[in-house]
Amino acid sequence: MEWTDDGIVLGVRRHGESSAIVELLTRTHGRHLGLVRGGAGSRMRPLLQPGNSVSALWRARLDEHLGTYALEGTRMRAASLLASSHATYGVTHLAALARLLPERDPHEVIFAMLERTLDDFDRAGGAAIHLIRFELAMLSELGFGLDLSACAATGATGDLIYVSPKSGGAVSRQAGEPWRDRLLPLPPFLRVTHDEQDGWSEQDLLDGFELTGRFLLRHVLEPRGQGHSDARAGFINAVVRKRTAAIADGARVMAELNPPST
C-alpha cells in the first residue's frame, strides 16, 4: 500500500532511539500518522515542526498498519510562527482542534482552511478572525454547525446581530430585542453581509471566541471529557495584549504629532 499527498504537520513524538511518529493532516487522507525513520535527529527537526507543509509518501504492507512516511518540505512556516507569541499559541491550538477529527477520514475543506489560516497568521487580529472561523468550520465538520444565514425566529436574512445559545441559530435585531440579554452577540465578521474591508474591535474578537467556544465545549469537548486547550487561552491573551499595545503606540504617536499648545 502506498499513496502520496499534501500534508500539514500537527505533531511529532519520538519513537525508539532515532525515529519519530509524525501526525499530519493530509488533503485527501485526513488526519494520518506514520513513522519517519531518523525523525528524532537534528537534520529532520526543522522539517517536523507543527505548521509546516510537506509532500508525504506513505507506505505500509497493509492499510491498517502505521506505515512509514517519506517527507519533503513544501512550505516551511514554523520559524515565522515561533517568532510571535500569538502564532506559537495559535498553531498549537489549531493542531489540538484538528485532532478532534476522526483519524484517516478525509476533510478537504478543513485542510484547505487550515492551510489558508497558517498562511495569513502574521497579524494578530487577522489571525484571531481566521481562528474563530476555523472553530466554526470544525463545528460544522463534526456535525454541529451553526446556522448564521437567517433568523431562527423569522427567517429574515438581514440585520442578524445575535445567536441563540440554545439552537445556535442567528437572530435578527428586531426579533431578538426582547431577549437580548439572553442571546449571544454575533460579531460583524461572522455575518453573511460582512465586508472584509470593515473594521473590527477587540470586543468583536472576544464575542467570536465566546460564541464558538461555548458550542465547542457543549457539543464536542465536554462529551469527550475535555476542555479548551491552554493554548487557546494563551492565544486570546496574546492577541489582546498586542491590540492594547498597538492602541497605546497609536495614541503616543498622535500625541507626538499634536503636542499641546503652550
From Swiss-Prot:
GO biological process, one term: double-strand break repair
Entry's transmembrane regions: none
Cited InterPro entries: ARFGAP/RecO, DNA_rep/recomb_RecO_N, NA-bd_OB-fold, RecO, RecO_C
A GO CC term assigned to this protein in UniProt: bacterial nucleoid
Keyword list, A-Z: DNA damage, DNA recombination, DNA repair
Domain of life assignment: Bacteria
Keyword DNA repair found: yes
Gene3D superfamilies: Nucleic acid-binding proteins, Recombination protein O, C-terminal domain
DNA repair found in the keyword field: yes
Family that this chain belongs to: Belongs to the RecO family.
PANTHER family assigned: DNA REPAIR PROTEIN RECO
Function: Involved in DNA repair and RecF pathway recombination.
Annotated protein name in UniProt: DNA repair protein RecO
